[in-house]
Amino acid sequence: MTKGTPSQGKHNKGSNHIVCRRCGRRAFHVRKKVCAACGFGRSSKIKRFAWQWKKVTGKGNRVK
């Protein structure tokens, strides 16, 4: 094995995120033990923000 730039390309094996057991998305960070999508591991509440939905003027439901 040599050192240098060619060797750095071999460092991209493996994955940081696995499937989250709460939301089912591939967003659970293995080392941090936190889901990037739903916040599992950090809080008991599902992670959500107002900017995720389009603002509605007048009557009607919010559209995702």
From Swiss-Prot:
Which PROSITE patterns has this protein been placed in? RIBOSOMAL_L37E
Gene name of the encoded protein: rpl37e
Question: Which organism encodes this protein?
Answer: Methanococcus maripaludis (strain DSM 14266 / JCM 13030 / NBRC 101832 / S2 / LL)
Q: Which Gene3D superfamilies match?
A: 2.20.25.30
The record lists the lineage as:
Archaea, Methanobacteriati, Methanobacteriota, Methanomada group, Methanococci
Which keywords fit this entry according to its UniProt record? Answer: Metal-binding, Ribonucleoprotein, Ribosomal protein, RNA-binding, rRNA-binding, Zinc, Zinc-finger
Zn finger (C4-type) start-end: 20-38
Q: How is the cofactor bound?
A: Binds 1 zinc ion per subunit.
What name does the UniProt record give this protein? Large ribosomal subunit protein eL37
Question: InterPro entries annotated for this entry?
Answer: Ribosomal_eL37, Ribosomal_eL37/eL43, Ribosomal_eL37_CS, Ribosomal_zn-bd
Q: Name one GO molecular function term.
A: zinc ion binding
> An example of a Gene Ontology BP annotation on this entry?
translation
One Pfam family, short name? Ribosomal_L37e
